[in-house]
Curated annotation (Swiss-Prot):
It catalyses: Thiol-dependent hydrolysis of ester, thioester, amide, peptide and isopeptide bonds formed by the C-terminal Gly of ubiquitin (a 76-residue protein attached to proteins as an intracellular targeting signal). Ubiquitin thioesterase that acts at the late endosome/prevacuolar compartment to recover ubiquitin from ubiquitinated membrane proteins en route to the vacuole. Also removes ubiquitin from soluble proteins targeted to proteasomes. Is essential to maintain a normal level of free ubiquitin. Required for promoting coordination of DNA replication and avoids DNA overreplication. Disulfide bonds: none annotated. It is a peripheral membrane protein. The keyword Metal-binding does not apply. The gene is DOA4. This is Ubiquitin carboxyl-terminal hydrolase 4. Residues 432-794 form the USP domain. Residues 170-294 form the Rhodanese domain. One of its GO terms (molecular function) is cysteine-type deubiquitinase activity. GO terms for biological process: protein deubiquitination; proteolysis. It is found in: Cytoplasm; Late endosome membrane. CDD domains: Peptidase_C19R (cd02674).
Amino acid sequence: MLEHNSKLFCKSLSQLSAVASKVVAEDVEGEHFKQLLAKCIDTLSIYKSELRKLSCASKDTPPSQIYQLNETLYVYYKIVSQIASQVIPGLAEFQQIKMNSKKDSKDKELLEIYSRLVSALANDKQIGEVKRFIKNHSEEAAHDGTQHSYENGEFVSISQLHSLIRHDNDSSGILLVDIRPRMDFNDGHIKHNNVICIEPISFKESYTDSDILRKSLITASDREVDLFKNRDKFRLIVLYTDTDEHTKYYWQQLEVLQDILCNRSFDKPLHHTKVIVLQNGVNAWKEKYPMELKKIMESAISDIRTKPVEHNFHPMALSNNNNIEKANSPSHSQTTSFTHYPDAPFLTNGASIKTAGLVPNQLLPSTSNLTKALQQNDEGNSEPYKLQPNGIKNHRQESNNHANGTNCIVSSNGNNSVAKSGHPSINLDFAIGLVNLGNSCYLNCIIQCLLGCHELSYIFLTNSYRKHVNVNSRLGSKGLLANYFSQLVQKMYQQGKLQAYNNTNMESTAVHPTQFKLACGSINSLFKGKQQQDCQEFCQFLLDGLHEDLNQCGTNPPLKELSPEAEKMRETMPMRIASAIEWERYLTTDFSVIVDLFQGQYASQLRCKICAHTSTTYQAFSVLSVPVPRARSCTIYDCFKEFTKLETLEKDELWYCPYCKQRQPSTKQIIITRLPNNLIIHLKRFDNMMNKNNVFVNYPNELDLTGFWIDDYNGEMPKDNGVSLPLRGQKPPFNYRLFAVASHSGTLYGGHYTSFVDKGRVGWCSFDDVSWRKIRRKDEYITPNAYVLFYRRVNM
């Protein structure tokens, strides 16, 4: 505490930090890990005791005592923080314990105590108030700040930062960290050579500096990543954000990041780097120095995110011709190789819907082309190529076809097999076990099954998915899930090759999916702990998450509801046409390779038994859940019959008919309107009370679902429609071949998941966590325990 002209001041943060540093230097020399931990715990206990004294202070407490308490608190906290973040990590003993894979119980206990200590420091809410009090009650620096010895957490004014940047001649002394969404950063940030963006949503209090590097900079450029890697080389790190009323969360996250850098920098402790904060934020900077802002042009960030692009497609007229155009029509020959990713379809702000909202005014590129582009775009193949969307012809073809009366539904090649020109050195039928992390067999079995889909494996093995990560997708994880899934797939591939080459022990080469599971848990807390989960729920979560990360239309506004007039007209159409229109609408907000590979569509139709009017809703699906009839045995076809059977709604289930204007007896039916390229069937064995139906469902290796696909097109087309509708692979027959089975034994909470996967030339294999083997009999994968079935479409 200082006194100047009879006025009390706190010592500055730098002075108090110097006191703490002196204590640490004199008091901890030569001490071991355990002794240092004991010293930290004792000091932290005193710190807590002093906090209680401060909280009990009243209006009558002398100011000098308040000042002294705050100074004491800061010194005690700083002592513990310096020992935990600088002294202990520098101990050879500590590093040896950390690196030792066979830790004894004492070492584990010490590391656990250390972890709790670091957590207590990181989660301390009072130290921020203490720092603010000291800053507000210490003498201000009289100069402009360029020579000022800053301390961690200190505020710097707009003018001071401007002066600091001007005097940073070699651009190596200051690193600016913009804590706002990347779109805001791209729209305008403080002009400086060394500036990075760390989005507020990308980190949390429990992170360390290495977590920031691994998890929070996914959307950053290589330049930004390099700057953060060299953060300890800068004299100052300046944090800034927005300070508007609606951005309070950003400011909270700024304080979290400040704490991480100051107190949780274990990978690269900031011994000589100070972390300071821009007062009043970037808003005030814009007002005072509008010319000192920098924007990032879209072309410069195209490798980070995919921007929506408006397509100048020429809509084709709908015709009343009775014949649907054949898929092998010469006028629809498909380009078989793409070397550039197709642009994302974009729903413009002024997008209109033809015929009272029935047909989008733009058709989207074929999603199967998206898959092929991903599969064939290797790292060395970056030559631009203008994509001709499948199902959309050029203007000359349009005019000719219109004159010749070509048809409403335009064909689209539905073959989504891996390109024959695929990477010859990649064996997509690799096999490797996955370690059970504690009831994580639900995760292991789904991963094994999904990797039976070669298209999916190829995309994530070759990193071609990266070009389609949309970090601005509203429901995505900013690429987090996709990146960790790719890392897991690549690790499995590498270990599978190693095991096959060296014929090594399965347990020693099995992959630990730890980081991937952590990523899943950070997105959905359901998968965070070690409780058993439903594997089909995890399958749905994973496919949905990957879709949102790769969703090229993830930033488009949600679809508007149809007007009553449009709904009424939709009900008069053949369901084949209405469902195609609805699918095109759906693709304006959901367009990804996952949609192409796995998503289908069904209609739920209500029909009034009095007036016969209908109301139909269309639903996309990635996993199709079908009921299992209660019988001694049944076939998969019985499940589909149960799924699509006509139900009668009476008594307590009366439907409110909008035409009769009252509740009426009605019928309800599910109708499959679109079958995907890879069909995932969930056998609903558990009822609402979690009781399991163990009936044996006989499912074939070859499955024909043509009879369950709606085919009511009669050639009668709605009038005044201006756009042709692509088939997008919806052309019978719909024949499927089984490629994987997830099986479940026991109850939902006390059971175990295993899987069977068709590994091509190797044949069918059984996977049980770390263990895998070839099947012992040819039909072993036809099991009474089958829970989720994976089929791929053939002969398209």
